[in-house]
Amino acid sequence: MGTVVPLPRLVDAHCHLGDVAFDPDRAAVLERARQAAVQHVVVIGTTLSDSERSAALAGAGAGLSATAGVHPHEARTWSAETPARLKALLALPEVVAVGETGLDYHYDHSPRDAQRRAFEAQLALAAELHKPVVVHARDADADVAALLTGVPVPVVLHSFSSGPTVFEAGMAIGAYFSFSGMITFKHWQWTVRPSDCPADRLLIETDAPYLAPVPHRGKRNEPSFVGAVAAALARARGEALEDLAARTSDNARRVFGARLDSTL
C-alpha cells in the first residue's frame, strides 16, 4: 500500500460566507471545506449589516474570523454614525480586520467622491485601532495607490489583479497580495506576474460565492475550492503546492493574528 500524502493546510483569506447564496447549506459548505484541508476562513463584511452577520458567524464557530467594513459599492451609505458602529464590531475578538473597503471605478455603484471619503475614513479607523485593512481596487489604480501611501497597518490587496502602480504602492508599504480564482482563468491578462510578489506577502482566497476557479467555473464558489487557487499560484511561481499552501497559511496568520489558530 502506498503512503498517504496529507493535503496541505489552507486558509481562505476572503469569503462572503454570510451571502444569501449560502443560506441553504452553510454548514455543509464548511464541512466540505474542512474535508478539503481548509483550516480557517476569513468572513468578509461589506456593509454594516453584513459585517454584523459576518461577526455573528465567526463568533459562533471555530475556524472562522470576520472583518467589518463598507465596500466601495456601498460607500454612499456612509454616515456620521458608521465609524462608531464599525468600532463596536472591531472590538470583538472574532473581528480581525477593517474591510472590505477601497475604490471601484469600474461599476461606480457609489459616487467616486463618496468612495474616497469612505475609504479614507476606514484607513484612518484601521490605523487608530491597529487593525489590518482589506482593500478592493478596480480600475482606480492611481487613487488607490495615492491613498495607500504611508498606511501604517498591514494592507491586504484582495483578489489582486491591479497594475504596476498599485503593485509598487503595495510593495512600498509591505502589503499582502491575495490571489483569487482569477489566476486560473485562461484568458486573464496579468500586468503584474504572481512570481513578482514576495513569498512572505502572498495570500489565497476564494471571494466566494463569486469567481469560482477552474475547474469549477459556472458554479457557486465556496471555500473548499481554494485549493485550486493554491495549485494555480504554485504553478505560476514554479513552487511545490505543499510549500505554497503552508506559506500562505503562515502569512494569513501573520496578518490577521492568533485568531487563525482556530480551525474548522
Predicted regions located by residue number:
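Mid-domain alpha/beta scaffold segments of enzyme catalytic cores
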Residues: 1-264
